[in-house]
């Protein structure tokens, strides 16, 4: 039996966290063959690769439905539970909603100490409670590799929710968390990371996107998504394509986790970054950035920040409030008229 005292959860999975996602290009090909569902109250479905589904219940209420689960992204079971829960809850915040209920999704090896599962679930429960939602049950299966996540339902006004499209020419792009989680988790698996840098990436992944969501609710948001497994480049590409615009990213303005440049320059890039790049290149990428910064743009994030397209006039006040909330946010780019490419990296 694998005991709690000796566990290193990240050693049990070839890909950690959102880096284990099926690539966006492969996924798009599979989903393209599925039947389309037509319902006037289904306000957001699969058509735009958005963060969650939105279903109108009444003129004043819509349900946000999402689920997310993945392999361990932290060695400590409690940390893993918190990160997985924060990541799953994030999709509701990315739509401008409020999480209300959650259900556990668990895969767990039969030869592993059940106390490890208890700690994973405790971490998830504490994060759901922090979000002000309620944990109402779940489902478990046996599997060789532990996996954990949540199915989450949230509420939103059907007239006010955010979509990952609608970005307008002249909008500025604001990112609310530092990048580099995928690169850092690769370095952590190789035992190359200092304790300070390890704590920084864990704190970032455990941070709810609630505060960022509450700030953005006070302003006009033309488009919003959260940056997770498809990386900043992949999610920005989805926003650009769906909005029929080009997104320009200024890599000098990107908020970055400690020591990311060192490890990226060493080539510690997760495989998901290359799949994300291939996806973006299908609709066109123009880059003049340093290689490590370009890799950072496509680095798959776990429980990453919100990426919002907002009017330029609101940027100073938004940044002031995000800073007051203790968020490591940055104005990282802009939206321009559609060019021959959809993503430009400077």
Describe the role of every protein-language-model region.
Residues 2-346:
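Helix-biased detector of long, well-ordered alpha-helical tracts
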């Amino acid at each position: 039996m694998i005991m709690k005292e000796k566990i290193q959860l990240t050693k049990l999975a070839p890909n950690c966290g959102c880096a284990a996602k099926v690539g966006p290009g492969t996924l798009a090909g599979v989903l393209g063959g599925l039947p389309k569902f037509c319902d006037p109250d289904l306000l957001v479905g699969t058509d735009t690769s958005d963060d969650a589904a939105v279903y109108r219940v009444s003129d004043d209420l819509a349900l946000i439905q999402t689920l997310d689960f993945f392999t361990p992204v932290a060695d400590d079971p409690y940390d893993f539970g918190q990160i997985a829960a924060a990541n799953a809850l994030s999709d509701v915040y990315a739509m401008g909603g409020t999480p209300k209920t959650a259900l556990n999704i668990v895969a767990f090896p039969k030869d592993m100490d059940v106390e490890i599962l208890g700690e994973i679930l405790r971490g998830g429960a504490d994060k759901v409670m922090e979000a002000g939602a309620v944990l109402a049950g779940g489902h478990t299966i046996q599997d060789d590799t532990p996996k954990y996540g949540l199915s989450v339902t949230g509420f939103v006004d059907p007239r006010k929710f955010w979509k990952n499209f609608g970005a307008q020419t002249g909008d500025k792009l604001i990112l609310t968390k530092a990048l580099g989680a995928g690169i850092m988790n690769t370095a952590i698996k190789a035992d190359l990371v200092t304790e300070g840098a390890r704590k920084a990436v864990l704190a970032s992944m455990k941070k709810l996107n609630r505060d960022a969501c509450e700030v953005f609710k006070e302003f006009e948001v033309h488009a919003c998504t959260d940056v997770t497994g498809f990386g900043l480049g992949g999610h920005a590409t989805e926003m650009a394509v769906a909005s029929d615009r080009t997104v320009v990213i200024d890599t000098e303005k990107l908020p970055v986790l400690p020591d990311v440049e060192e490890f990226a320059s060493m080539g510690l890039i997760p495989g998901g970054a290359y799949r994300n790049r291939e996806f973006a290149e299908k609709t066109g990428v123009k880059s003049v950035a340093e290689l490590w910064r370009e890799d950072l743009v496509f680095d798959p994030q776990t429980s990453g920040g919100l990426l919002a397209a907002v009017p330029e006039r609101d940027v100073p006040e938004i940044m002031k409030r995000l800073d007051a909330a203790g968020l490591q946010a940055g104005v990282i780019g802009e939206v321009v008229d559609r060019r021959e490419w959809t993503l430009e990296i400077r």
